[in-house]
């Protein structure tokens, strides 16, 4: 169970961030189940209190086939099946950030269960940014009202009897949040597995220096904290993995072990410069910035996605 954050690292461009000085709770390990989505390399999580059997879902996936334009709930239904099979009660549906590589199933799960949805409060900054890029009408809200709760940095909540808090972790996006629940931290697109480095920071609102500073905050969590990443791309064809430790990240992640802040910023910026845009980014963000809701149906009863043409430079090669 996390007890303290020793130091708070200020992030560039923001006032100093703070997190709870201490957490108290059951002292038991969080019961974490990861379900891997091979199509996007994403991991969706169920984290449960082993005593009360109450749980949260983190980063649920709504399946989308780009060729046919069809959505399916296969991955999200796996979450519901697991929750039912293990006698769990869903208490939270949590997004760590608006994803660029898959659709969020938060809206679907809320409809199916009634559990509240949540994300970091700075999602409103990302909504404003992308409203301009999509040229959306003023009727589209950019106040975060698509979620039931917007977490501030350091804000506490509970999952069953387990104490939890939200840790603002920008860099990949403006509003990325790490959820620390019991002794588990869900670090999304900051740290990947130690053999895979770190997440990109070149999306609109992304910043490599902020990503470095966010990672340093995560690494200052108690040494017993288990780290759960948001993606795994199976380098060299190995089996998918998603759990690591602070010690293994410090010792084996080359983006941390071999870098100080200026070196990391250069490495990350150089790598990002030649990365292709995620296949689903322009489709996914207009859904994910609406809390995992498809656009409102038009007069024929069908929803349509809007793609801004020539809004981003093409990466050649």
Which residues does each PLM region occupy?
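Active-site HxH/HxHxD metal-binding segment of metal-dependent hydrolases
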Residues: 62-162, 251-252
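Conserved beta-strand hairpin/beta-sheet module of binuclear metal-dependent hydrolase folds
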Residues: 28-89, 178-188
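Accessory terminal helices/loops
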Residues: 2-30, 122, 206, 213-226, ...
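Active-site neighborhood of phospho(di)ester-bond hydrolases with catalytic His/Asp-centered motifs
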Residues: 58, 89-98, 118-121, 169-171, ...
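Adenylate-forming
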Residues: 200-206
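Core dinuclear metal-dependent hydrolase active-site scaffold
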Residues: 31-37, 46, 153-181, 220
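Active-site environment of divalent metal-dependent phosphoester hydrolases
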Residues: 40, 63-65, 98-103, 124-127, ...
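Aromatic/hydrophobic pocket-lining residues that form the small-molecule binding cavity
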Residues: 76-79, 211-215
